[in-house]
């Protein structure tokens, strides 16, 4: 504090010495009536104890002079259209006082905002540094609002991080931090946070974020809270929490544009703030304000990215987007389809409109957009009414360009065609050939393991659903599910299902649990029944679905192999009892492999309260599966 006081006194003495001849005629307030008398501080003020010229100058600072209009210098600065006009003010006889030099630098940064070459030339100009030194000498009397704009301008002008003048302005900002209004702090954070990180001013940035967090209750403007969430929220977890609280408080005042910005910001930072998302969803449903196409697309993206399900919002988004479909670009259609697929929300009229959009622009649509739509359709298991022309277009586009796609994307596309039952032999061969699939064998990353899991599904499709397919196939040694498929945490439904089945089986050799198959699917349980529906020991009989196949005895005539499959809530489309495409593919594969399926969906199991009810439910399911097979 002592060093700070000495610095300020030095600056005041220097200014007082320079302005001393002009003190007497300027420093009085002309009263409308009565004796004209300077209005100075009381005798007990600190300035009254300062000696000589410093005391006179401080008293001069405290004299109130009425504002009679814009000074000529300020007008010249504001009207300047070229940097040279501002630099010439130094030698043209104009007296640059208080904020003038700072305002000139701010205007310089505005004029050069899009001229990086001119910035480099400016920094080499001696007049620029003279102007900067003048600001530094007057830094203590620069107004708060001008000071924060000045710091932002110095960052944008590209001053070196070691510049003493830049550090001086930064230090002045730190000294005044407590006195700055919240809007000044917010402006500085929004406009200069990136520069502070790049310029090595991390201490100033950290202090700024602390003040913003502590004084968050001062935010009263919805524009300010939205802008801060977008520009600075990602820099501080605690600040973002406060901004979310303030946003929740002001959300009733938000218009569609503010709601869009908040949602996109949350999605970009992957922050699933449930109370805020619920409040935004409520206002989207209740308020009748119109939503433009771009806002609708951004809302769909944000909800999809965050995985936040709100049926009424999705219904409004789908209904409002449908009329915009003819005017949408292929990129927007692909993006929107992908967003709704992430949400597992299948709106048939909207998806059919997307298909029609693609067919109407068959010659111009690009393969990446078509691939995104194909993957989205496979996720929600959507089969369009005009599937023949649509998939003909897909195969036509893939014919020569499939091998040019990124390897993981090639697997995704062929897998999606398998889900939708539209894959062709050439596409199977493209990803099952040894030259291609070996790059994914033994992959340790989650992405590589996921891709190889899809290769197992593609291989199973070739074996089970395409009897005319002649190869190639994956090697037998590779037909092993990834460890992650068996290491997943046990769910309550899975645990209860296993406990109930163990009670029904009575003996451990009569059934198996968590059975990995060579098709890439894991069975929750497997049992073997003879013609009398009696349980048989599994280990005694051949099991071709395992890797490697086990057992030596062939199945008795009429024996049936049952697979139990539990279906959790995430396995279904939103607000539907229709399985997602991935799980429909699993059912098809296991049926083609000779299993009788016992489906155990969560919504049926939840209604069973006692162990007796659960046992009776499974027995009834097994009887129905056998009866359906016999009825064929």
UniProtKB/Swiss-Prot annotation:
Principal place of residence: mitochondrion
PROSITE patterns associated with the record: RAP
Family matches, as InterPro entries: FAST_2, FAST_kinase, FAST_Leu-rich, RAP
Transit peptide: 1-112
Keywords: Mitochondrion, Transit peptide
Domain RAP: residue ranges: 562-620
Source taxon at top rank: Eukaryota
UniProt GO molecular function: RNA binding
Family stated for the protein in its record: Belongs to the FAST kinase family.
PANTHER family recorded: FAST KINASE DOMAIN-CONTAINING PROTEIN 4, FAST LEU-RICH DOMAIN-CONTAINING
Cited function: Plays a role in processing of mitochondrial RNA precursors and in stabilization of a subset of mature mitochondrial RNA species, such as MT-CO1, MT-CO2, MT-CYB, MT-CO3, MT-ND3, MT-ND5 and MT-ATP8/6. May play a role in cell cycle progression.
Identification of the protein by name: FAST kinase domain-containing protein 4
UniProt source species: Bos taurus (Bovine)
């Amino acid at each position: 504090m002592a060093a700070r006081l000495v610095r300020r006194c030095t600056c005041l003495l220097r200014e007082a010495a320079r302005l001393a001849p002009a003190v007497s005629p300027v420093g009085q307030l002309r009263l409308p009536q009565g004796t004209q008398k300077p209005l100075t501080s009381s005798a007990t003020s600190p300035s009254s104890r300062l000696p000589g010229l410093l005391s006179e100058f401080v008293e001069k600072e405290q004299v109130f002079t009425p504002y009679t209009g814009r000074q000529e210098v300020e007008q010249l600065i504001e009207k300047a259209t070229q940097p040279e006009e501002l630099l010439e003010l130094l030698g043209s006889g104009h007296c640059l006082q208080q904020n003038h030099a700072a305002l000139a630098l701010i205007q310089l940064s505005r004029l050069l905002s899009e001229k990086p070459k001119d910035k480099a030339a400016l920094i080499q100009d001696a007049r620029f540094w003279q102007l900067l030194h003048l600001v530094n000498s007057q830094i203590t009397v620069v107004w708060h609002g001008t000071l924060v704009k000045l710091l932002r301008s110095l960052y944008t002008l590209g001053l070196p991080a070691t510049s003493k003048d830049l550090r001086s302005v930064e230090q002045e900002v730190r000294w005044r931090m407590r006195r700055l209004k919240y809007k000044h702090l917010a402006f500085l954070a929004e406009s200069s946070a990136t520069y502070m990180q790049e310029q090595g001013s991390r201490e100033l940035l950290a202090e700024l974020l602390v003040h913003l967090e502590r004084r968050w209750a001062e935010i009263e403007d919805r524009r300010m809270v939205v802008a801060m969430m977008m520009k600075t929220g990602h820099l501080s977890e605690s600040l973002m929490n406060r901004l979310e609280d303030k946003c929740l408080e002001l959300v009733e005042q938000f218009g569609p544009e503010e709601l869009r910005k908040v949602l996109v910001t949350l999605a970009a930072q992957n922050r699933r703030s449930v109370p805020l998302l619920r409040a935004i969803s409520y206002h989207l449903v209740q308020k009748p304000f119109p939503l433009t196409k771009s806002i609708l697309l951004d809302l769909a993206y944000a909800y999809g990215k965050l995985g936040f399900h709100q049926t009424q919002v999705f219904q409004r988004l789908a209904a409002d987007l449908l009329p915009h479909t003819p005017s949408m670009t292929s990129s927007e259609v692909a993006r929107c389809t992908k967003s709704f697929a992430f949400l597992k929300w299948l709106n048939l009229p909207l998806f059919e409109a997307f298909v029609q959009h693609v067919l109407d622009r068959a010659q111009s649509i690009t393969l990446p957009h078509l691939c995104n739509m194909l993957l989205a359709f496979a996720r929600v298991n959507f089969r369009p009414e005009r599937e023949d022309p649509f998939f003909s277009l897909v195969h036509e586009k893939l014919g020569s360009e499939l091998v040019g796609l990124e390897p993981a994307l090639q697997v995704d596309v062929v897998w999606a065609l398998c889900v939708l039952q539209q894959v062709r032999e050439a596409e199977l061969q493209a990803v099952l050939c040894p030259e291609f699939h070996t790059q994914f064998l033994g992959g340790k990353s989650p992405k590589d393991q996921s891709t190889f899991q899809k290769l197992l599904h593609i291989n199973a499709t070739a074996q089970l659903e395409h009897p005319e397919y002649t190869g190639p196939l994956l090697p037998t040694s590779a037909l092993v599910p990834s460890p992650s498929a068996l290491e997943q945490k046990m769910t309550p439904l899975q645990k209860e299902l296993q406990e109930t089945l163990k009670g029904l089986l009575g003996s451990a050799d009569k059934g198996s649990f968590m059975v990995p198959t060579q098709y890439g699917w894991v069975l929750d349980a497997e049992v073997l029944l003879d013609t009398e529906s009696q349980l048989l020991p599994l280990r005694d009989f051949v099991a071709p679905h395992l890797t490697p196949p086990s057992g030596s005895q062939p199945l008795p005539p009429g024996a049936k192999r049952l697979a139990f499959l539990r279906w959790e809530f995430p396995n279904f489309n939103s607000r539907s009892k229709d399985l997602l495409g991935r799980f429909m593919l699993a059912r098809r594969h296991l049926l083609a492999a000779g299993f009788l399926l016992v489906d155990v969906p969560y919504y049926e199991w939840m209604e069973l309260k006692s162990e007796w009810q659960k046992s009776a439910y499974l027995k009834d399911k097994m009887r129905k599966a056998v009866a359906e097979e016999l009825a064929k």
